[in-house]
Amino acid sequence: SIWEASGRWEAYHSSGQMFYCDMPNGSFCMAPTAEEAVFEFVRDNLKSYKDLPVNVYQIGNKFRNELRARGGLLRSKEFTMMDAYSFHASEEDLEHGYSIMKKAYLEIFDTLGLKVIPVSALNGDMGGKISEEFMFLSESGEDTILVNENETMAFNTEILEMDNYSDYLKQYYGIDDISTFTERHCIELGHIFQLGQKYSTTMKGTFKSNTNEDIPFFMGCYGIGVSRTLAAICEQNCTNEGLIWPDNISPYQLTIIYTHQKREIAFELYDCLQSKGIKVIIDDRYSLRLGSKIKDWKLLGIPYMVVIGDKCSGEAFELETRRDGSKKLLAKNDLINYLGKSSSAYIGT
C-alpha cells in the first residue's frame, strides 16, 4: 500500500525489477529500495519543525531482479547497501544536509583508497531535481560519463538526452563548457539525491511549522553500494598473484605460514602477536606444502606475510610486504612494533 501511495508500485512491478508475491491478504515485495518504508516511519513519528532535521540510515540487503546481472559483486540480484534518508523543514536546509552527506561520502571513499568523481545525473524514478553519482573510473564499468581534464567534474551521458541539457548543467551543477570533456567508463559506487517534497506530497506527510502550518517534509536520499565498493577495491588492488587488501580494511594484517617442523615456533609467535592486538591468522593445514600455502594466501590478499621455514631459529622472522614485495628480517619485538604501527591505520582503531 505504501508503494502504491508513492506511485512507484506500478513502475517497479511492470519493469520486472521487483521480486514480489501475491497473497490472500495483499501483495508483498522484497525491498529494492526503502524510501517508502522510511518515509512512513518518519511521517508517523515527526510532527513539528522542532524535530527537524533528522537523518536515519541502515545497512542491509536489497533485492532487485537485475536484467543485466554480471560481474559477481558489480551487479547482482541481492546486494548489501548503506542507505540514508534525511528530512528537513526547508529546501535550504535540505541543500545544507545534502552538502554534508556529499562531503562525508567523499571522505569515506578516500579512507578506502578509492578515487571517485561526483557526477551530475538525472534523478529518474527517484524524483526530485538534483542528484550526483560517485563514479570509480574503470574500463570494466558499464556506465559512461563525460569528465573534464582534471577529473574534478563530470556528468552522466544520459543528461545529453535532455532538450535543455546545457541550461540544466549550468543551473544545477555550474558546468558551462563541455567541449573539453571526454568519455570514460566507470562503476557507480554511490548516489545521493535531493528529492524535495515528492514523497511527502504523494504520501501525505507533513509537519507543523513555527506558524502552525502543515508543511510537507523536504527529503534527501543517500546510498553506497557496499558490495559494489568491495568489487572496486578488489579491482584496484589485484595483481597477477592475487588480491592485496588495503591495510585499513583487510580482515587480518598478517598471515603466518610454517613448515611442519616449526609448528611450535609459529604458534608462539601467533600467540604473542594476538596478545598485542595484532590481527593475525595462522595456516595450520597439515596436508599442504609450504609453497601451496604461500600461493593460497597471496590469492586471499592479506597485506603482510611471515614464512617460517626449516632454518628459522625463532629469534628473527622474515616479513614480506605484499604491496611492494619487499622482505625484511626482524627480531620478534621489532616485528611487533612494526605491525603495531601498521594497525593504527585500521578503521575503528
Describe the function of each predicted region.
Residues 1-349:
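NTP/phosphate- and nucleic-acid-binding module
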